[in-house]
Amino acid sequence: MIDRLEKIQEKYLRISEELNSAKDPSSLKSLYKERSRLTPLYLKVEEYLKIYKDKKDAEELIPSEKDEEMHSMLKEEIRRASKKLEELEKELEILLLTPDPNSGKNILVEIRAGTGGEEAGLFVADLFRMYSKFADKQKIKSEIIDSAPTGIGGLKEIIFALEDERAYDLFKFEGGTHRVQRIPSTESGGRIHTSAVTVAVLPEADEEEIEINENDLRIDVYRSSGAGGQHVNTTDSAVRITHIPTGVVVACQDEKSQHKNKAKALRILSARILEKQTEDKKQASDAIKKQMIGSGDRSERVRTYNFPQGRCTDHRIGFTSHNLSAIMEGDLEELIGALTEEDRARKISETQVH
């Protein structure tokens, strides 16, 4: 283990040296980001290695130490050092976890109505409200990118951006199918209906990650339509972009300006292409899949919201809250904390420090 920790020291110091000589803005940005990520680990490694050295020095002195009091002091020093090293090993286990490559990124969140007709559309709007309230509490900037209203207060689909370095880590477990059980306001017999919506969390691509060639795009423009399909604009402001190499298609009609819709569509396109690339890599690596709490796939059932019982259950970790009303108001800290801890515990069990 000492060799591994010394290599971390060397890497950190090498990056610091490279920062002093780097002049290219993109290299500087990348180096600063990497050093910032490594700093907490480097400081903990420094502390561990110092205590480890002190313990070794004390162990070497004990055989030749004749003074009984000094012998006793050295043994006590070794005992304290051993205890502290055990504590530091646990902290290092967490810090040594392979960082998620998407950590620190802005994200796009896409919520779509699934089975359940109008009820599903209403729940899309409810989930968007829940996420918006949680983002507000966390002081995370949000922006609607595109939406498709149903006309009765619901949404067929909504895509919104969350811009903050904590956004991905806080929302990464939200991807999948969210099921809702409740009595619709139009239901006179009091029967509980079950409907579902799907959530996708798409990390936004950095410029260096995705390079889109204009020649690979087919761009179509058309008139935007509102609820019920009626045209809401007299000009061709809506934009549909097809990325020919991957077959990824996105459309945006939220803005009145074709230029703004194109910019938003390109933003979604970059995130979708990155998602496709990530999924391809995941399928090629069973090890990555095993490390995750759920796959984040749209088809995976992740959570049930039971309104008659006031209960919310996350099926991946068996977490149940009987305070559904608070959760729908954006109180997601306990739930997200439980998911984060479970994910961390699983990863630590596979990456022991020895």
UniProtKB/Swiss-Prot annotation:
Subcellular compartments: Cytoplasm
Domain of life assignment: Bacteria
Principal localisation: cytoplasm
Pfam families: PCRF, RF-1
Modified residues (N5-methylglutamine): 230
Region of interest called Disordered, as start-end residue ranges on this chain: 282-301
GO CC annotation: cytoplasm
Listed NCBIfam families: prfA (TIGR00019), PRK00591.1 (NF001859)
Matches recorded under PANTHER family: LD18447P
Protein purpose: Peptide chain release factor 1 directs the termination of translation in response to the peptide chain termination codons UAG and UAA.
Similarity comment text for this entry: Belongs to the prokaryotic/mitochondrial release factor family.
Protein name from the UniProt record: Peptide chain release factor 1
Organism of this sequence: Leptospira borgpetersenii serovar Hardjo-bovis (strain JB197)
